Amino acid sequence: MENMENDENIVVGPKPFYPIEEGSAGTQLRKYMERYAKLGAIAFTNAVTGVDYSYAEYLEKSCCLGKALQNYGLVVDGRIALCSENCEEFFIPVIAGLFIGVGVAPTNEIYTLRELVHSLGISKPTIVFSSKKGLDKVITVQKTVTTIKTIVILDSKVDYRGYQCLDTFIKRNTPPGFQASSFKTVEVDRKEQVALIMNSSGSTGLPKGVQLTHENTVTRFSHARDPIYGNQVSPGTAVLTVVPFHHGFGMFTTLGYLICGFRVVMLTKFDEETFLKTLQDYKCTSVILVPTLFAILNKSELLNKYDLSNLVEIASGGAPLSKEVGEAVARRFNLPGVRQGYGLTETTSAIIITPEGDDKPGASGKVVPLFKAKVIDLDTKKSLGPNRRGEVCVKGPMLMKGYVNNPEATKELIDEEGWLHTGDIGYYDEEKHFFIVDRLKSLIKYKGYQVPPAELESVLLQHPSIFDAGVAGVPDPVAGELPGAVVVLESGKNMTEKEVMDYVASQVSNAKRLRGGVRFVDEVPKGLTGKIDGRAIREILKKPVAKM
């Protein structure tokens, strides 16, 4: 019988630099945070307000909240949720949940009411930790999601509008004089115990609840401490993040930073001048961004005003970054390249990462320790050799436990042999660098040709008059779909639809021309992490052009 899996075509990641440690995610996190607390290290800094949280303060508050949650009545398998924008208190409930074996479901106050009802309806939390901004929505959601018994205000030092703040909740649910040092973390079955319930990207409808275990989380901790695939561990190192904490990318990079003792400098929103000033003032060595912000930095006229000599790394994730934009930004910051990572919410974190000192323009990186990857033919499903495009599949100990109450969708994603089918088109080269080309679902089918939107977006972004662009297929009764684009022009620049179409036609093969037309817009529709919203672009392109 023919072996369907040619082992030569399976790319295997290296052995881990450090072995996976014993204990739950909470046990490991506490051990490292105690170490950094003794060193007097700072855990979080809000660059806008200047507020600092030391590791000692953060650990104490997380232990006290863990005890308060237990006394409130939450036991292993209980559920809590967050509904908040990024704030310095965001990770206190997350860490407390990890300490006591309670599943944590992060959401953002930017969610619409419909999205929030859907998300919290999946995770069914008993307590929601809400920011002041998110409170009205959570109060409304509570009427529908009746498991929610208590709302606690996350980002206030005093009670707010009749709802208890974090300190009040802790005080009410811990004995007088309670010492955080007496609190004991709960050991759990790592493989089975759900640590976090994340929202899938929702690119194919409303998000699903992704169950990530303590095993998934501690594997990520091992990668975070890996000097080749993660960080050089030096406590006190300042890193700047503007990535949403409720998203897998922001959640697991930040938990990884805490394992390494870094000072997480956060901006609650992106402003070019504040961003550059923060990099300079806090001597940040690394910054983590979503691709949307690269276009702004690429065209920035403020860069030369600031001393960014401490910056040694720009990391990108959450959505694909075009090779050209990545290279241009790296040049402007005098860096050898941009550090990329590729992963899905369902793989916990990045499972393909640029190894330290092994940049390759356009590549997403190499397979991380403890993981395997392969590229399969879209028709035969056989694994392919180097430089042949197909669907990327991955296997390893950070694959989710499954979707909440959705075994059918779980089976569609992860096959019987344990391979997760990513739905992304890609290939790897002879040196085992992986290149992600586009989403399988977003490929435009024009007369039997498969046209990747990302390739056309990359071509458009190279034009000096174009600031940003997004591409999608427009339904057509004869051709199937026609490639079309929405374009944001640089300030003060003008182009006609024909000029854009002619420019693209001069750069690509016949099937890839913009036959679906061009629309000029103020901004390209994108999700929170900078992922282009193909469905919204398709709707814009389907509308007839308004006649002047």
Swiss-Prot record:
Gene Ontology MF terms: ATP binding; CoA-ligase activity; metal ion binding; Photinus-luciferin 4-monooxygenase (ATP-hydrolyzing) activity
GO terms, biological process: bioluminescence
PROSITE patterns named in the record: AMP_BINDING
UniProt catalytic activity: firefly D-luciferin + ATP + O2 = firefly oxyluciferin + hnu + AMP + CO2 + diphosphate
UniProt entry tagged with the keyword Magnesium: yes
Compartment(s) where it occurs, according to its Swiss-Prot or TrEMBL record: Peroxisome
UniProt-listed Enzyme Commission number(s): 1.13.12.7
Sequence motif Microbody targeting signal, residues: 546-548
Known cofactor(s): Mg(2+)
Disulfide pattern: none
Classification via Pfam families: AMP-binding (PF00501), AMP-binding_C (PF13193)
Cellular component, GO annotation: peroxisome
Top-level division of the source organism's lineage: Eukaryota
Function: Produces green light with a wavelength of 544 nm.
Family indicated by similarity: Belongs to the ATP-dependent AMP-binding enzyme family.
Protein name per the record: Luciferin 4-monooxygenase
Species assigned in the record: Nipponoluciola cruciata
Lineage: Eukaryota, Metazoa, Ecdysozoa, Arthropoda, Hexapoda
